[in-house]
Regions:
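Active-site lining segments that contact anionic ligands and/or coordinate catalytic metals
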Residues: 269-270, 304-306, 320-322, 326-328, ...
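Short, contiguous acidic/charged loop-to-helix segments that flank catalytic cores in large enzymes
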Residues: 25, 284-304, 330-339, 358-364, ...
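Conserved Class I SAM-dependent methyltransferase catalytic core
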Residues: 14, 21, 30-43, 236, ...
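Non-catalytic, mostly N-terminal accessory regions of nucleic-acid modification and defense proteins
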Residues: 1-192, 251-264, 357-360, 381-390, ...
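A generic secondary-structure signal for well-formed alpha-helical elements
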Residues: 42-55, 164, 214, 218, ...
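Hydrophobic alpha-helical scaffolding
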Residues: 124, 146, 200, 228-232, ...
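Conserved S-adenosyl-L-methionine
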Residues: 171-275, 280-296, 327-330, 338-352, ...
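C-terminal, active-site-flanking charged/polar segments
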Residues: 348-352, 361-413
Length: 499
């Protein structure tokens, strides 16, 4: 049976349920940083305490030596920031201040975390009694007992991000891309080594999945260099924490910044670029960037930043670089604001490698999306692969769909066969199309135009027999319809309404 991405959730849900009692009246973004910050603090304290105990038992007096912890990618936790100190203050009015001070102490001892951790636990809006109750609950949960890998907090962190996304609906796009979508991008691009870049990195999901991919395939995570940025200060800090506990070294800029106006990596030429930019962003400042060097294929319209994001990424590509990104479906066919001409120029430059039409309801928005894969040095020159994946996926809630592992593999395998030159078109699912044929379709990139309609199996029965059966069934339906019509008229007449 296909396994989806919400399987095996137990410990993560336990943490989430415990944290939910904090909701109260505080702002959603503040609540998010409080919950994720508390999870972060508990986990790094657990890891530190385990190593501390081990060093004490060795008896060499190295338990306060920071190098002993750094060598194993464990953050050094000062005495006032250890969970035992937090737990002791759980039922005091000062619990918020104690946690804030703990965060400051951790930042001071671990330069990588400077100005990253949330320090808003003392704010009046946060109910200190409830905060103390959550501390008690966390005290009874030993996170490292659920696994000794840094991935444990990562899973919890990712689960909580998905729950926040569920709560915030369409507003969640700024910090969260569904993991099955990210995994699809990663499985197609296969970023084993080189420079990986996300110009709108949210909470860092693209980087996390890249690291997982490398580890799952026996690669070396140190062979990739991670670069990114995000304009939202809260989201930027979430990404820093997310990557820190995964042990992923990253350059996300010195502060949060607008990618179009303050590119943190102006000289970067990346080998892999993965992104889920804000859908159809308007008011992005186009009038101030009219002659920008990045607009090699045409100036993007002021009312929609889709092709600004796309061209920004193309500008940052290395000579053999590749892009995997999420875009709203309108970008496949739009002719407004010069978008059609930009798309035409990008296609004629032989940059479009593959387009995947994705199923609906993968995101917390009704906007249909596609995956764009572009390459500076395509293996299949003058050809583009179209995949119509709209029928893939499984509903995991009434509103949300996920791609299964098998779905993701099917897309990745199809792409790999295309690159190898062994792919055969499959009606209704995939087709390899020349640039000339795309031009004949006015440079529209909607996969449905090219893959055709799925072939229906013929049961082999004679036409006359089928028609006889179908007309008989239709006659029965007509008879039932007349009977129902008569009953309705009779009941309406009984209450004084004649038809």
């Amino acid at each position: 049976m296909a396994e989806n991405n919400t399987s095996n959730i137990g410990f993560e849900k336990q943490i989430w349920d415990a944290a939910c009692v904090l909701r109260g009246n505080i702002d959603a973004s503040e609540y998010k940083s409080v919950v994720l910050g508390l999870i972060f603090l508990k986990y790094i304290s657990d890891r530190f305490e385990a190593k501390y105990k081990e060093l004490v038992e060795e008896g060499d007096g190295f338990e306060e030596d920071q190098d002993e912890y750094t060598a194993e990618n464990i953050f050094f936790v000062p005495e006032n920031a250890r969970w035992s100190a937090i737990a002791a203050a759980a039922h005091t009015p000062e619990i918020g201040t104690v946690i804030d001070d703990a965060m400051r102490s951790i930042e001071k001892e671990n330069k990588r975390l400077k100005d990253i951790l949330p320090k808003n636990f003392a704010r009046p809006e946060l109910d200190k009694r409830r905060l103390g109750e959550v501390v008690d609950l966390f005290t009874n949960i030993q996170m490292i007992e659920h696994g000794n890998s840094k991935d444990i907090l990562g899973r919890t962190y990712e689960y909580c991000l998905s729950k926040f996304a569920e709560q915030e609906g369409k507003l969640a796009g700024e910090f969260y891309t569904p993991s099955c979508v990210v995994r699809t991008l990663v499985e197609v691009l296969q970023p084993f080594n080189g420079r990986v870049y996300d110009p709108c990195c949210g909470s860092g999901g693209m980087f996390v999945q890249s690291a997982k991919f490398i580890e799952n395939h026996g690669g070396n995570i140190n062979k990739i260099s991670v670069f990114g940025q995000d304009s939202n200060p809260t989201t930027w800090k979430m990404a820093q924490m997310n990557l820190a506990i995964r042990g992923i070294e990253a350059d996300l800029g010195k502060f949060n910044a607008d990618t179009f106006f303050n590119d943190c990596h102006p000289q970067l030429k990346a080998d892999f670029i993965m992104a889920n930019p804000p859908f159809n962003l308007s008011g992005w400042g186009a009038d101030k960037l009219v002659d920008d060097v990045r607009w090699q294929y045409g100036t993007p319209p002021a009312g929609n930043a889709n092709f600004a994001w796309l061209q920004h990424m193309i500008w940052h590509l290395a000579p053999n670089g590749r892009i995997g990104m999420v875009l709203a479906n309108g970008s496949l066919s739009s002719q407004s604001g010069g978008e059609g001409e930009i798309r035409k120029n990008i296609i004629n430059a032989d940059l479009v490698d593959c387009i995947v039409a994705m199923p609906t309801q993968l995101f917390y928005t009704q906007i249909p999306v596609s995956l764009w894969f572009l390459a500076k040095n395509k293996k299949q020159k003058g050809k583009t692969l179209f995949i119509d994946a709209r029928k893939l996926g499984t509903m995991v809630t009434r509103k949300l769909r996920e791609l299964t592992d098998e779905d993701i593999k099917k897309i990745a395998d199809t792409y790999n066969a295309f690159v190898d030159g062994t792919l055969e078109d499959e009606k209704g699912f995939c087709a390899v199309v020349t640039t000339q044929d795309i031009a004949k379709q006015d440079y529209i990139l909607t996969p449905g135009r090219y893959v055709g309609i799925e072939e229906q199996e013929d049961d082999g029965g004679p036409f006359e027999v089928k028609m006889g059966r179908l007309t008989s069934e239709l006659s029965e339906l007509f008879t039932k319809s007349h009977e129902l019509e008569a009953q309705i008229k009779e009941r309406l007449g009984a209450i004084g309404f004649e038809i």
